[in-house]
């Protein structure tokens, strides 16, 4: 799109948001485009990010989106891990809320706040007001896997993450928040 707009004197950048809707005002941005084009929108980005430290100029047009896909693959991996551990906790008669409380207080916090957010949504059963749907995650997983193949670097763990989320969607949870993934994992064990 940037190439089509350039002859008309229109600048274009890719500036995907890195964060959930609850983080508005503190989002990070992976920015792709020219220095000149980014300078024109910097004030808007500062309002959305809250600080210059959250604005990352990744490279030319398209590179911001590439980094976003990698970021979402990491989110998907954390989601798949949370799905399995939360399903196993329930299967063994353990409290999902207690698992999250202990994991966040212990070393699982190194996984980021995503684990805490996903785990909390699971423990509270909040899936109907999605911050990011299972099907959206599948779309980004596919784009990331395709991108990796184009670079001659197939992702083994990424393919497993994609498999988990496709299984979740096939079970009818595609439009739900991705935190619902644990239910699909648990259904497979109870079958």
What annotation goes with each model-predicted range?
Residues 1-73:
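Rossmann-fold dinucleotide-binding core
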Residues 63-189:
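Helical "substrate-binding/catalytic lid" subdomain
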Residues 8, 190-191:
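Eukaryotic N-terminal targeting leaders
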């Amino acid at each position: 799109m940037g190439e089509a707009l350039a002859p008309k004197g229109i600048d274009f950048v890719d500036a995907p948001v890195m964060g959930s809707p609850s983080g508005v005002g503190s989002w990070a941005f992976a920015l792709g485009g020219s220095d000149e084009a980014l300078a024109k929108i910097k004030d808007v980005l500062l309002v959305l990010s809250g600080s210059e430290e959250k604005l990352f100029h990744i490279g030319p047009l398209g590179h911001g989106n590439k980094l976003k896909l990698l970021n979402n693959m990491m989110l998907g991996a954390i989601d798949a891990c949370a799905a399995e551990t939360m399903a196993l906790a329930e299967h063994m008669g353990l409290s999902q809320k207690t698992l999250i409380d202990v994991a966040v207080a212990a070393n699982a916090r190194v996984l980021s706040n995503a684990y805490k957010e996903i785990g909390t949504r699971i423990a509270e059963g909040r899936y109907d007001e999605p911050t990011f749907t299972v099907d959206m995650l599948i779309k980004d997983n596919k784009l990331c896997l395709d991108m990796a193949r184009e670079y001659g670097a197939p992702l083994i763990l990424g393919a497993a993450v994609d498999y988990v989320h496709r299984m979740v969607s096939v079970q009818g949870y595609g439009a739900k928040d991705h935190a619902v993934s644990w239910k699909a994992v648990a259904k497979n064990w109870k079958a």
